[in-house]
Amino acid sequence: MSSAQNIKKSILAPVLDNNPIALQVLGVCSALAVTTKLETAFVMTLAVTFVTALSNFFVSVIRNHIPNSVRIIVQMAIIASLVIVVDQILKAYLYDISKQLSVFVGLIITNCIVMGRAEAFAMKSAPVPSLIDGIGNGLGYGFVLITVGFFRELFGSGKLFGMEVLPLVNNGGWYQPNGLMLLAPSAFFLIGFMIWAIRTFKPEQVEAKE
């Protein structure tokens, strides 16, 4: 397989074939919390992709110099440093979104996707493939976040990126926002529908009956 095909596979596979949320069921908490608006879902996607990609890269660079007994601590230190950088950038340039994301930016440190890729892939692979793997898994995570955020904001507020899309009753229109879509259970249902849809088109992802 050529280098270009490897890169393409590493980036696209986590979107549908091996999605970290839909297939591995990782990172669900933030998917519930930050998807009431498309804007916050998009920013969280960028933040997680940035942290996952660079943490993979740096862990891979020093992987042969990390004692096995402290490898998790070293990985968490690298991830925490990158999360602090992201948090400070958001507070400096996107303060309102930073307040909306609240503690969930800091909780990227404990995100199973970030830790999982550092341990399972970056510790065993070269820096560039690790970087690409991090980008792919960040995009796979973001695919679910942005899809869920799209439907929650559209039907919960009648808006997208804060701009009115469906004419609201309060403004003389016809659409009455569905408040249920702004509650966490709606994200569970939407993620469930996404898992059902993906596994309908990719039946190989369905677990074998015991």
From Swiss-Prot:
Its EC number is 7.2.1.1. It catalyses: a ubiquinone + n Na(+)(in) + NADH + H(+) = a ubiquinol + n Na(+)(out) + NAD(+). Keywords: Cell inner membrane, Cell membrane, Ion transport, Membrane, NAD, Sodium, Sodium transport, Translocase, Transmembrane, Transmembrane helix, Transport, Ubiquinone. Signal peptide: none annotated. It comes from the Bacteria. It is found in: Cell inner membrane. The chain crosses the membrane at residues 42-62, 72-92, 103-123, 131-151, 178-198. InterPro entries: NqrD (IPR011292), NqrDE/RnfAE (IPR003667). The keyword Cell membrane applies. It is a multi-pass membrane protein. Its main location: membrane. The keyword Magnesium does not apply. NQR complex catalyzes the reduction of ubiquinone-1 to ubiquinol by two successive reactions, coupled with the transport of Na(+) ions from the cytoplasm to the periplasm. NqrA to NqrE are probably involved in the second step, the conversion of ubisemiquinone to ubiquinol. NCBIfam families: nqrD, PRK09292.1, PRK12405.1. Composed of six subunits; NqrA, NqrB, NqrC, NqrD, NqrE and NqrF. This is Na(+)-translocating NADH-quinone reductase subunit D.
